[in-house]
Amino acid sequence: MSAGSGLKHEEHNVGDEDVNFLQIWIEPKLQNVMPRYQRRFFPKDKRKNKLQTIVSNEEGQEHCWINQNAKLSLGWFETNNTIEYKLNPLNKGVYVFVMEGALKSGNETIGRRDAIGFWETDTVTFTTEQESEFIIIEAPINH
């Protein structure tokens, strides 16, 4: 979703079952642009042991577009897989959020519903300690 010049937004769970989702807000590159909304379905089996881009600033049919030099990727990896993620030269920050499982980067283990940030690096490497689902959020960082 690109709000353009602003929006009012509410979320309500009208059902009886618990809902788990992430709501991620990224500041736009350009302000006051035409509002835009996209919806895509990302089957889990399409990302087994690989990263699947779900949001990017590049137009495409396989992911949603964003008005920012940002990229969001989902991963679903079996135990003992090593993932090496190379950052876009325009970006200087990556945030990895673990939805299920556990990842290890250096001496740090990141468990379920935990996250870690990386900046001032070109590559991020981590290993799955168990079967894991996670999202990588790459975006410009202003220091």
Language-model segments: residues:
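Jelly-roll (double-stranded beta-helix
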Residues: M1-H143
